[in-house]
From Swiss-Prot:
HAMAP family: FAD_synth_arch
Taxon lineage: Archaea, Methanobacteriati, Methanobacteriota, Methanomada group, Methanococci
Job of this protein: Catalyzes the transfer of the AMP portion of ATP to flavin mononucleotide (FMN) to produce flavin adenine dinucleotide (FAD) coenzyme.
Enzyme class: transferase
Name the record gives this protein: FAD synthase
Protein origin, superkingdom: Archaea
Names of the cofactor(s): a divalent metal cation
Species the sequence originates in: Methanococcus maripaludis (strain C7 / ATCC BAA-1331)
InterPro entries: Archaeal_FAD_synthase, Cyt_trans-like, FAD_synth_RibL, Rossmann-like_a/b/a_fold
Gene of this entry: ribL
Amino acid sequence: MEKKIAVTAGTFDLLHPGHFNTLNFAKKHADELVVIIARDETVKKIKGRSPVIPEEQRKIMIEALKPVDRAVLGSLTNKLEPILEIRPDIIVLGPDQTTYQITELKSQLAKHFLYPEVLKVEEYVRCPFHSSFDILKEIVRRWCCKELKV
């Protein structure tokens, strides 16, 4: 029996419980989890700002997490390219991912004769720092205009 492969993708800039929730969800649905890390240049285009952590470091950090079997950098020219190379059985979208709607993603992949199951994590982890942006805002709030003590 072949191993079931799941793919999920994201920036994974400042890790928080929401990231881990999505990774665990994806791993529960497959034998192998491959994570596609958004490129710095892509993040800047989409979010209007560069990630705090460079792409290679984000890749290393994600690969170190227990649910993850492998991490790869996304394509600079075609966001479907890594998915077409990996050919996963399952694609997991995080609760806040808006790059693709499920029907649009399935339609795009079908043009390449790829028909994975596409799942969306419905549970949005609510905690004080449930997004990378919230973490950044708190750092600024605590440390802006203060002398850092090491």
